[in-house]
Amino acid sequence: MRRLVVAAAAAALVLTGCSAKDVISAPSGSNVDVAAPDMVAMKAKSDVEACPKPQTDDGGLPSQTLPCLGGGRKVDLSRLKGPLVINLFQGECAPCKKEMPALEAFYQKYGDRVPVLGIDTIDTIPGVALRQAIQRGVTFPMVADPGGDLQGGPLSVSAVPTTYLLTADGRVERLKRGGMESLTEVKERVEAELGVAL
């Protein structure tokens, strides 16, 4: 069943403009190394922050542990606390690359109140995702879900990029399917879901 869900997600991603090589074309997620030595070295030379430590016992996300992109501590999503912006992306997805500076600008300005977490999803070439993020100045932490293990849950995607908001009370709300153009757009969407001004 999981293979069908992942296959359906892959097909949907292709239909939204990502090429087949952006999606699943190789081994299952369990066989993809998201902390290969070249990725670890690339991350060490960058300003990408370490993956977050556990913050709570049950923050509202499913109990799913994902590896840190480029090496570092694994992240149990259920131990993360909202509010938190969660962006699902792929390295060779043009709208994902275009959106990264807006998310980074939001993280720099409001990350102390509403952090950002990137998830490289359904992507068997995570080194490309890490390199593209670093080239665009991303510093927020990123994890990887190369096999699409999140599909079927609250962080499912039918297209990338897709951005969600985990609220302080544990709700998961979709901010947008597709790329956000600016810091202002990210801020306004977060404020609308939280019901507060940042």
Predicted regions and their residues:
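Thiol/disulfide oxidoreductase modules built on the thioredoxin-like
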Residues: 134-139, 145-198
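Active-site-proximal beta-strand/loop segments in catalytic clefts of secreted hydrolases
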Residues: 88-90, 119-122, 145-146, 176-178
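A generic structural signal for alpha->beta connector loops
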Residues: 82, 113-114, 139-140
